[in-house]
Amino acid sequence: MDIDPYKEFGASVELLSFLPSDFFPSIRDLLDTASALYREALESPEHCSPHHTALRQAILCWGELMNLATWVGSNLEDPASRELVVSYVNVNMGLKIRQLLWFHVSCLTFGRETVLEYLVSFGVWIRTPPAYRPPNAPILSTLPETTVVRRRGRSPRRRTPSPRRRRSQSPRRRRSQSRESQC
């Protein structure tokens, strides 16, 4: 089964893969940030947003993974095997959790559209040969807040204001009072 945890948010695993693994903060830093900014919403029984829900799930998943790692660490006798398991969890699963946490914390902090625009900008920047790209990569916090991601398809037709009609010099008849009471 090929499940992309970013699909419903307009992103993809491939889009996040353009960011190097050392781009993402440590899980501890991401958990501290999520807790500092969104603790009340994350602990609330109310539904806040799909990003809050996804963040809750990623945090719970990481907690369960740490429980498993602790169990493996205390029950696996062979130090080499234990090191392999710990390394695999930290490198592979840790990166996926760091990406998930970063994505959802960033979407809650900067807005989904801004994060998507950043991912696209970074993807374009990293794929451009070094000789033709600016020396510095785009930075999420410096993107303009009014970034607009244009959707494909026809743009909405703009209505031009109609010209004002000339008022006649003759007095107008009053409409009945019953019309004014309607909303």
Swiss-Prot record:
InterPro entries: Hepatitis_core, Viral_capsid_core_dom_sf_HBV. Its main location: virion. The lineage of its organism: Viruses, Riboviria, Pararnavirae, Artverviricota, Revtraviricetes. Gene3D superfamilies: Viral capsid, core domain supefamily, Hepatitis B virus. Phosphorylated by host SRPK1, SRPK2, and maybe protein kinase C or GAPDH. Phosphorylation is critical for pregenomic RNA packaging. Protein kinase C phosphorylation is stimulated by HBx protein and may play a role in transport of the viral genome to the nucleus at the late step during the viral replication cycle. Self assembles to form an icosahedral capsid. Most capsids appear to be large particles with an icosahedral symmetry of T=4 and consist of 240 copies of capsid protein, though a fraction forms smaller T=3 particles consisting of 180 capsid proteins. Entering capsids are transported along microtubules to the nucleus. Phosphorylation of the capsid is thought to induce exposure of nuclear localization signal in the C-terminal portion of the capsid protein that allows binding to the nuclear pore complex via the importin (karyopherin-) alpha and beta. It comes from the Viruses. Keywords: Capsid protein, Cytoplasmic inwards viral transport, DNA-binding, Host cytoplasm, Host-virus interaction, Microtubular inwards viral transport, Phosphoprotein, Repeat, RNA-binding, T=4 icosahedral capsid protein, Viral penetration into host nucleus, Virion, Virus entry into host cell. This is Capsid protein. Residues 136-183 are annotated as: Disordered. A motif (Bipartite nuclear localization signal) lies at residues 158-175. It comes from Hepatitis B virus genotype C (isolate Vietnam/3270/2000). The modification Phosphoserine is found at residues 155, 162, 170. It is found in: Virion; Host cytoplasm. Residues 155-177 are annotated as: 3 X 8 AA repeats of S-P-R-R-R-[PR]-S-Q. GO terms for biological process: microtubule-dependent intracellular transport of viral material towards nucleus; symbiont entry into host cell; viral penetration into host nucleus. Belongs to the orthohepadnavirus core antigen family. One of its GO terms (cellular component) is host cell cytoplasm. The gene is C.
